[in-house]
Amino acid sequence: MLFRLIYDDDLAQASYLVGCQRTGEAIVFDPERDIDRYLDLAAAQGLRIVAAAETHIHADFLSGVREFAVRGNAKAYVSGEGGADWQSGWVDGCDHRVLRDGDSFEVGNIRFTAVHSPGHTPEHLSYLVTDLGGGADTPMGVITGDFVFV
């Protein structure tokens, strides 16, 4: 499994590229709108980005999840938590899945499980990461977005 932090010093914003080297599939969490840097990084690692996810709605920068869904043919994963005022309405017409606490999905041999973690924003999700390809049945880490800064 590839787990890569992409950090923008100007925005003080972190995103993550997580890829299954066995299947060549990858996902990006909290990408910036300009998705070319992620596509280039994935290609350099022999990966194809098939999904993009948000941990929460971003007010401080433009998310690239929609751009991946529209231009990159990637499935979008967004939160269904937080009530009607905290939903990503832009996903209509895109290949997407609305996630709630406990929902899981897989990219390659990696399982991601949504954990509702309100605080920073009401709809915020963190994602438990389990490397099924490595034989794991318990999470090896968690992607928290702006819920926890490490």
Regions from the PLM with identified roles:
Residues 18, 27-29:
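Conserved catalytic cores of phosphodiester-cleaving nucleases, focusing on short active-site segments
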Residues 1-3:
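Extreme N-terminal starter segment of soluble prokaryotic enzymes
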Residues 11-12, 23-26, 33-116, 130, ...:
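Active-site HxH/HxHxD metal-binding segment of metal-dependent hydrolases
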Residues 59, 63, 123, 149:
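Short active-site segment of divalent metal-dependent hydrolases/proteases
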